[in-house]
């Protein structure tokens, strides 16, 4: 492990590369300050992760605003990155300030900032963040051995650069059950892997003394149970996970996912659920009263259930998967 170079400074011009950006940041931060003076809840958060965390910089601002909260949120992501990759990218940035492997997007007061490329040191030093979040990649999130030492080292480095920031861990979710040999096995596997994921994140959060867990995986599982999601061989049953799903029959006449189907990531409705969970956890508000519903959620009863599941997950509710 290389010693952390706390005196390292990013190229400010790279992040504030035009006056329009700087003016927008200044005006929005002034608005946040005024809101704080008026008693509104304010928060700045940086999400370090991959495609399982990246949607929040777009989906969370309208939910937070609807709850009367001021939000400055950014995402630093590399597709598919696990904690080991994040740590290795951090070490590389310590010796090469021009190494910028992360896509960086930010929304201040609901206004999106043009995306750029950064390294983690730049992302962490861009703002005096209130919260920094980390997560494990979904494909290994159920394996406790994959969290150490990389996640521990990463959290330690974050604390040295952002000593005032609270550290939160996003708990990820398990996939749709269509990758197993049959649907029944897939549903059983989903239940088992979800429990392993929850336990692995809890152990990691305790070990690094995280300030909290953002229980997104638990919220997804609660929604699956409470709807309830009823899977069929060619139907995802209303799950909030999955994109561009289509099914085809194989040579034996059995249904399978067609090429190009995404059975891992959140669908548009799932991104709304994620925004509810993050808002509830980070701001400490009851999102069951949230007046905003994302355009992707057309059924009021589903929207109400998502709000309830988000609130329950944040309050500590946890269930194994009973979907069939």
Features from the language model and the residues they span:
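Sec-dependent signal peptide recognition
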Residues: 20-25
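Alpha-helical cap/lid subdomain in secreted, periplasmic
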Residues: 116-268, 289
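Conserved catalytic region of serine esterases and O-acyltransferases that act on ester linkages
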Residues: 232-324
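Conserved SGNH/GDSL esterase-like catalytic core that processes O-acyl groups on lipids
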Residues: 54-153, 157, 176
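Hydrophobic h-region of N-terminal signal peptides that target proteins for export
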Residues: 27-35
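Short hydrophobic segments within beta-strands
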Residues: 46-48, 170
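Residues that mark the start of a beta-strand
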Residues: 42-44, 72
